[in-house]
């Protein structure tokens, strides 16, 4: 019987400041967690400078994941970057067909993906952290090569712990600390056959270049996918970058510093149909093709939270062996006795007059076994929201917005 890896991907997008991350090692309440990276130093990554290939791979993966995770008429918020970080670490322990399926879904060979992720430099607006917790009962002999790869390319910490209530507390505290306390309880329980947790946490805090003034905000109505009405605080502004293709219109709204933008995309038809027909190339072309045309933009304030299980969505992307007895994750412990059981994803997103603040956490639970016509975009019915990294051309967060709360 294989030891089961239940891959728990929880992503929370939260509007709120990102405080500085703690640097001290995590010790559980009994003080018995062991820092497995104590004798491992992250090595400089050669040629970690080109994120061009990662842009295409990440956008393709993001749209494909959204298609398979979204439910008709329901709001879903995802951090594909967080999911890819967790799967990237996993791929460093995968071999054979399991690795090939991961590489195909992620859009890059793992060696290239590792270097591309290492080239992405977080800043004051966007922070990313990774950590691994292994069961400290002698059931796993963790590969030093696996730990080295996670340290080199993902900056991961790693701990051996007793996997009792104190370990659950440690993991939850780590996630809370790295998401500015926006995800206080990542794990409700530790499964009795859990052998490893791979955890990613993201935090995004983007302030608008020009915050909305009080006279640009009013009480309005948002019409959900089923035609019902929600009271909404609507925010109006004139933006300079207009989005338009045969299927949608929208706008780009920049955050201070210039690196990130919010892309708000309003389909000509239903959001469900638009998402199902969308692909990565079309999304990149729409955003890259933004025109210097003024647009009167109306954006609702948002308070969103979604929770979903992503194992089926990842299977739909061709990642099958990872979840059954065919899994080969022998790069983690030298044995072919690990597989992935579940992938949980939780996300929270808030947009207001000051900007967008987001946090994300991914946990892999490894168990035993000029004068021109002004355009107008009124976002008073379902639309697609993207937080876009203009520097690396990466989608940091996506949301299919079918409601404002």
Per-range role (PLM):
Residues 211-213, 265, 274-280, 363-364, ...:
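Composition- and surface-driven signal marking solvent-exposed, interaction-prone regions
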Residues 4-163:
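Detector for small/aliphatic-rich hydrophobic stretches
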Residues 96-102, 271-274, 306-308, 359-360, ...:
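Extracytoplasmic/secreted cell-surface and envelope-processing proteins
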Residues 102-104, 212-219, 275-285:
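Short Gly/aromatic-enriched secondary-structure transition segments
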Residues 198, 249-265, 371-405:
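Extended hydrophobic
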Residues 27-33, 73, 114-268, 288-370:
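Non-catalytic, conformational "gating/processing" segments within enzyme and secreted inhibitor domains
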């Amino acid at each position: 019987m294989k030891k089961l890896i239940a891959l728990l991907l929880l992503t929370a997008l939260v509007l709120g400041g990102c405080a500085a991350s703690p640097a001290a090692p995590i010790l559980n309440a009994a003080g018995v967690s062991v820092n497995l990276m104590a004798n491992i130093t992250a090595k400089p990554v050669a040629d970690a400078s080109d994120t061009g290939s990662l842009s295409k791979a990440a956008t393709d993966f993001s749209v494909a994941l959204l298609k398979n995770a979204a439910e008709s008429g329901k709001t879903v918020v995802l951090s594909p970057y967080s999911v890819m970080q967790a799967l990237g670490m996993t791929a460093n322990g995968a071999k054979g067909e399991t690795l090939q399926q991961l590489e195909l879904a992620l859009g890059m060979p793992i060696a290239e993906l590792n270097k591309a992720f290492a080239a992405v430099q977080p800043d004051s607006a966007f922070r990313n952290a990774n950590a691994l917790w292994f069961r400290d009962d002698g059931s796993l002999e963790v590969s030093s090569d696996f730990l080295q790869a996670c340290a080199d390319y993902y900056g991961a910490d790693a701990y051996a712990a007793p996997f009792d209530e104190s370990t659950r507390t440690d993991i939850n505290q780590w996630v809370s600390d790295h998401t500015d306390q926006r995800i206080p309880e990542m794990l409700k329980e530790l499964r009795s056959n859990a052998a490893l947790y791979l955890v990613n946490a993201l935090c995004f805090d983007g302030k608008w270049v020009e915050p909305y003034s009080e006279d640009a905000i009013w009480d309005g109505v948002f019409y959900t996918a089923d035609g019902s009405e929600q009271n909404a605080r609507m925010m109006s502004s004139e933006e300079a970058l207009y989005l338009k293709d045969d299927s949608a219109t929208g706008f780009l709204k920049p955050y201070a510093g210039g690196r990130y933008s919010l892309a708000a995309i309003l389909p000509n038809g239903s959001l469900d149909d638009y998402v199902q027909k969308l692909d990565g190339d079309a999304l990149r072309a729409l955003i890259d093709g933004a025109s210097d045309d003024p647009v009167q933009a109306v954006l609702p304030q948002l308070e969103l939270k979604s929770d979903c299980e992503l194992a089926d969505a990842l299977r739909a992307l061709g990642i099958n062996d990872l979840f059954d007895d065919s899994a080969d994750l022998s790069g983690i412990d030298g044995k072919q006795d690990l597989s992935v059981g579940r992938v949980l994803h939780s996300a929270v997103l808030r947009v207001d007059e000051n900007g967008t603040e987001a946090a994300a956490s991914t946990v892999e639970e490894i168990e035993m076994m000029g004068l021109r016509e002004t355009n107008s975009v009124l976002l008073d019915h379902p639309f697609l929201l993207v937080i876009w990294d203009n520097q690396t051309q990466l989608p940091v967060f996506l949301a299919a917005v079918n409601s404002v709360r």
